[in-house]
Amino acid sequence: MALRFILGRAGTGKTRLCLEEIRKELRQAPDGPPLVFLVPEQATFQTEYALALTPGLSGMFRAQVLSFRRLAWRVFSEVGGAARPHVGDVGKRMMLARILARRRNELRLFGRAAGQYGFSGTLAGVLSELKTYLVTPEALEQAVRMLPGTAETDSLQAKLEDLRLLYTDFERELAGKYIDPDDYLTLLAARLGESPTLRAAEVWVDGFAGFTPQEYAVLEALLKAAARVNVALCLDPRSGRREDLELFQVTRDTRARLAELARKNGVELERPVELAGPPARFRANPALAHLEREFFRRPTKKFAGPPENLRLVAAASRRAEVEGAAREILRLSRERGWRWRDVSLVVRNLADYHELVATVFADYGIPCFIDRKRPVRHHPLVELIRSALETVTENWTYDPVFRYLKTDLVPVSRGDVDLLENYVLAHGIKGAKWADPEDWHYRRSDALNRPVPNGTGAPAPSDRDRYLREKVNRIRRRAARHLLDFQRRVQAAGTVRELTAALYDLLSDLDVPGRIEEWSREAETEGRLEAAREHRQLWDGVVELLDQVVETLGDEALTPEEYGRILDSGMDGLQLALIPPALDQVLVGSLERSRNPDIRAAFVLGVSEGVLPGRHGGTGLFTDREREVLLAAGLEVAPDTRRKVYEEQYLVYIALTRAGHYLWVSYPLADEEGGALAPSSVIPRLRELFPGLREETLALEPEGTAPGADLPYVTAPGRTLGFLVTRLRDWKSGVTVDPVWWSVFNWFAAHAGWRERCAPVLAGLFYENREPRLDPELTPELYGSRLVVSVSRLEEFRGCPFAHFARYALRLKERDVCRLAAPDIGLFFHAALKTFEDRLREAGMEWDALESADCTRLASAVVEELAPQLQSEVLLSSPRLRFLTGKLERVVERTAGVMAAHARHSRFQPVAVEVAFGPGRDVPGPAYPLPGGGSVELAGRIDRVDVAHTDNAAYLRVIDYKAGPRSLALDDVYYGLNLQLLVYLEAGLREAAALAGRECRPAGAFYFRVQNPLLKGGTPVPPAEVAPRLLKAFRLQGLVLDDPALLRLMDDAIGSESAIVPAGLKQDGTVKKKPGVVSAAQLERLQEHVRRVVAETAAEIQAGVVAIAPYRKGQANACRYCAFKPVCAFDPLLESNRYRQLRALTAGELWRLLGLPEEDEPGDE
C-alpha cells in the first residue's frame, strides 16, 4: 500500500506521465495485475481513446479507464451489493413528489412550495448534495440542536427540520427495496476492500482539483486496498510565492487531506514526482508560457513585444463573438492544417452559448460536439405522452388533442391534421363529440346574419361539402382510434401499474419504437449522428422511466391527473448524456466539465464580469450565510466562500492554460436584449501583462471599406453568401464597400452549384415589393361585370388597395374559429335591438312609453331567443360564456332604457330598422357613374332610420349601432377612410319616400354605442344624477346640422350642452361651434366629396389597382390590425414600401380643400 503524488503546473505533462507509466506496464506485462486510471466522468472516453491509440500495444486487458461511478459498478459486479432495483433521478423525483404530497401539511417551511411544479426536483438535488457530503438525517437532527436559538437561525432551523423529515421518509422508502445512485460511492467505500481485482491493482488518479467527502471515502478505501495509488495534482511543487500558494490552494488542500488519510491508515507516502521544469506544453510559445507563469504573480512582469498566438477580442454581441470564433477556427484549420479535434471551445455558462454555437458552427460547416446533458421536453415522444394524458384528463379539449396529433407519431399526415384542425376549430368540437359513433354533421352558419333554416327546407349540402364531411370523418376516426382505446384503459385502471400498462399499450399500438428507430436511421443517413443517438436514448429513457414508475409506485391508487403530474415531473428529469459521436470534432463545453488533453487551440468565450471568475450566491435551498452557520455547527454541506474564491482563481488558470499553441479570449459587449456587459477582471490583467497585445473589436456584420478589410468574413460559402447580400445592399444604398466582395460575387457566379443558390438571394436585392395593376381582362372575372360594393369594402380599399384585393379578389380569410369575438358581439347587439324593436311593434308599444320593467322583460326574452343562434351556440358552450350572456342581457336592457329616454326627449322616432339597400334588397342603393363609363352601386344595411315631422318639413337621420367607442373625424371622411355615415344618410334620403312616406331633409348621421357604462367618480353618484349621467354616456356621435330648431327636435331639453347629440346652444340661441356640427352647405359639400371618392375608388378597383400602399395618419395605420400582412410582406424598411402619409386636417383646412370659406375652429364655447 503506497501513495505517490505527481505534481506540476499546467502543461508540465502530468497526464502524459500517467499514460506513459500505464503503457510501460502494459508493454512489460500485458497479463499482469490490473491498472486503473481514475478520471472524471466526462474525460473517460477521451482518455480511453488516447490509451487505445498507443502504438505497439499487444492488448489493453490490464488497463481500465474508470470514473468513480464506473468503478462502483465494477466493484459491485465482483462483490455484490447492488442487486436491488436502482432508483434514478426520475424515480427519486416521483418518490419525493409522493412524500411531499403526504407530508405537505406537516412541513414548517416547505408546505407551500411542496405543491409547486418542479420542487421535487429541487429537493432531489438537495438530498443528493447531502449524500455527497455524507450528511445523514441524524446529522441534520444534531445540527438543529447545535444551532443557536436566534431570529437569524429560525428559518434555517425550520428548513433543517423539514429536510430531516423528508430525508427520513425517503430513506425509509428505499430501505431494503431500492438503491439510490447517490449512495453508490458510500457503498463502494464500504465494499471496495472486498474486491480481489483492486487488492493488487495500481491506480492513477488524474483530472481532479478536489474531491467530495464521498470521493475521499472511496480514495481512503483504495489506499488501503490497492498496491499503489498515484494522484496527479496541478500545483507548483517548489514555489513558495504567496500568489502561487493561493492559486493552487484547492489542490494543496487536496494533497494535504490525502496525505493525512495515508498516514491515518498506515499507507506509505512515497517521494512525489515533481515536474518542476518549464511546462512542455508551452515550449514553442513564449507568450503562453509567460501567461501561465505570470498571470497571478505580482509585481507584473510584462511581456516584451507583441504576443504571437494570443488574441483578445471584444465582440458586439454573443453571436458576433461565436461567429468570430468560428471564422478563426476555419482559418486555423486551413492555414495550419489542424484537425477539428485539436480545437476546444470553453465557456463558463454553457446555457448562454450552446444554441448559438450549434447554429453558427453548422452554418460554417464546423463539426462540433457540445458536452452537455440534453433536456428532452422538446421531443415529440415526450409531447405525445404528455398530450395523450392531458387529452383524457381534460376531456378532449382542443390544445392537447392537436399537440398529440402533431407529434408525427400518430398515423395521420400533417395535411390531414390541418384539415381536421380547421374543421374542429370552426365548429367548436370537443369532449364527447370525439367519441360519437355517428358521423359529424356540423354546418357552419351564422343564424343572426345569414340564417340557415333547420329541418325541412334547409339547403342541401353541395358535393364539396359532402366530400369534405366524409373526408373529415375518416380522418377523425383514424386520429382518435388509439386515443379512445387509451381513454378506455385509463378509465378502467385502478393502480399506477395499470395506468402505466395503458400508456405502454398506446405507445405499442402507435408503433412508437419503430417510428423512433426510423427517425434514428434517417438522422444517421443525413449525418446527424447526435440526433440519431438522441432518438434511441430517449426511447430507452422513457421505457426506464415507466419501469421506475411501476417499481416505485406500482400498486398505489392514483387518479389519472395525479399520475400525469408525477409522470410529468419524471419526464422533466429525463436528460440525455451523449458521448462524442465522431472522433474529429471541435469539443465545446463548460469550463468545469471539459477535459481536453493535447489540444492545440483553446477558445475561451464569454469572459464577462461576474462570469469568469464567477460571483457566488446561495444555490439550492441554502444561502451562503446558512452554509457558514451550518459549518460552524459541524455540518459541511458545500465549500465555504473562501474556498469558492480559490476555486474561481483556479478555473481562470485552467481556462488560460488549456492549449499549448494558440489562445483566444473574448467577451461580448452586450447581451441579446442590447444590455451592456462589462469585461471580466481577466481582460485588464491580460492587457497589463501584454502591452503589445492588440485588442480586436468584432462586429456582427462586415463594415470595411478599405481593400481586404472584410477578408476575414470570407470563409464558409453559406455564411459568406449572407454577408455578400448585406454588403451589396450597402453598396446599393451608396455606401463604399471593400472590393473583395466583387471577387466573392464572381466566385459564386462561377461555381454552378452555388450559382443556383445565389441567384434568388441576390435577386432579392433588386426586388421591389410592388404589385402591378391587374390585366384589364382579369378584373371583371375577379369582381364581376357589374360593380356592387359595400361601404366597408370601399373603406378597405382606401386604407390599402392590396388588402381589398386579398379579401375580395383572392377571397382570403382567417380560418373560422368558433369563439366569441368583438364582431360577433356587435352582430349580436344589432340583432338584439332589431328583435327588441319588432317585439315592441308586435305589442303595439312605443319607445317613449317604455318602462324599466318592460326593458328588463323584453331584453331577457330577446337574449334568450338569440343566444342559441350565435356561432353554433357558442354562448351556451361554457359556464364563462353563459355568464357573459347575462352581461349581454344587461347591456341590451340598459341600451333599451336609454333609447326610451331619447324617445321621450325627442321628436325623432324610428321609421325603419335594419334597412338593407342595394340590388334586390329592401330599397335601391345609391349608384354613381364612373369616369371611364359604367357605374357603381352601393349596398349596405342601415341600423335605424329616424324621422321627425314639423308643419313645413320632415327631417331624417340615420343611426349606426356600435359595440365599441366610435367617433367621426371629418378628415377621415375626406380621405375616404370613413364613408359609412355619409353614404347611409344619402341612401336614406334617396329612399325617404319609401321609408317615411314623404321626402325628407337631412338632419344628421350618428353612431350609437351599445353599452352598459360604468359611471366613474371619486364619490358615490347621487341617485338624482344617475339618469342624466347615463344619457351623457350614451350621447350620439357624428354629424348634426347647425339648426337650433332642428336640435330642439332632437333634444327638447337642450341647453349649453345636449345629453343626446354632440351639440349645444349659446345664450343667444344660436348653435355652438363643435367638431360634429356642420352647416347645410358644408354637409352638401361633404356629400358631393363622398360621391366623388366613391366613384374614384370604384374606378380604381375596376382598373385593377392592387398596390401595397397602406395609409398612415398619426399613430393610426392600415397594417395595425390587418390579417394579410404575411401575404403582402410589407416592410417599411424597403425603399419600395412606404406608408401613404395622410396629414391630419383642421376643420379650416378641410373646408378650404372642399372649396368653402374657412370658419373659426370649432370649440366648446
Swiss-Prot record:
Keyword DNA-binding: yes
Annotated positions binding ATP: G8, R9, A10, G11, T12, G13, K14, T15
Cofactor: Mg(2+); [4Fe-4S] cluster
Cofactor binding note: Binds 1 [4Fe-4S] cluster.
GO molecular function: 4 iron, 4 sulfur cluster binding; 5'-3' exonuclease activity; ATP binding; double-stranded DNA binding; helicase activity; metal ion binding
Segments forming domain UvrD-like helicase ATP-binding: 1-298
Keywords of this entry: 4Fe-4S, ATP-binding, DNA damage, DNA repair, DNA-binding, Exonuclease, Helicase, Hydrolase, Iron, Iron-sulfur, Metal-binding, Nuclease, Nucleotide-binding
UniProt domain UvrD-like helicase C-terminal: residue ranges: 279-584
EC top class named in words: hydrolase
Keyword NADP: no
Pfam families documented for this protein: ADDB_N, PDDEXK_1
InterPro entries, A to Z: ADDB_N, DNA_helicase_suAddB, DNA_helicase_UvrD-like_C, P-loop_NTPase, PDDEXK_AddAB-type
EC number: 3.1.-.-
PROSITE patterns according to UniProt: UVRD_HELICASE_ATP_BIND, UVRD_HELICASE_CTER
GO biological process, one term: double-strand break repair via homologous recombination
Positions that bind [4Fe-4S] cluster: C800, C1119, C1122, C1128
Sequence similarity: Belongs to the helicase family. AddB/RexB type 1 subfamily.
Protein's job: The heterodimer acts as both an ATP-dependent DNA helicase and an ATP-dependent, dual-direction single-stranded exonuclease. Recognizes the chi site generating a DNA molecule suitable for the initiation of homologous recombination. The AddB subunit has 5' -> 3' nuclease activity but not helicase activity.
Subunit structure: Heterodimer of AddA and AddB.
Miscellaneous section: Despite having conserved helicase domains, this subunit does not have helicase activity.
HAMAP family the UniProt entry points to: AddB_type1 (MF_01452)
Protein name: ATP-dependent helicase/deoxyribonuclease subunit B
Organism field: Desulforudis audaxviator (strain MP104C)
Gene it is expressed from: addB
